[in-house]
Amino acid sequence: DKLDHMGIDVGVVSGIVSIIDYKVTAKGMSNHAGTTMMANRKDALVGMAKLIVAAEERARELSDTLVFTVGKIAVSPGQENVIPGQAVATFEMRHMEISRHSQKKFRTVNLNL
């Protein structure tokens, strides 16, 4: 993709990206969607959505060459009339040089759910 944008036809591979996967769980409290007022909800999916946005912003801050993706989310109990009590997502991070230090920086997301 980068070579196309730069108008270069041929490139030489200088490295292979490292891939780190995280399984992330957000826990809330399941309850009936019709009778639980907004102020009393602890929606795990809303918490996961906030965490995904914060992690994406953090990835952008850390490096122009780090990529971050969430490709899968499972919500429990998974009913449209029930507030989700749990959301589990797979976070994937790719970079040429993923050190323990950069992993620690990525994991540090200050979020008050």
Task: Report the location of each language-model feature.
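Short, conserved charged micro-motifs
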Residues: 98-105
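Conserved hydrophobic residues forming the short capping helix/wall of the S-adenosyl-L-methionine
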Residues: 59, 112-113
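Midchain, well-structured core segments that form catalytic/ion-binding scaffolds
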Residues: 1-98
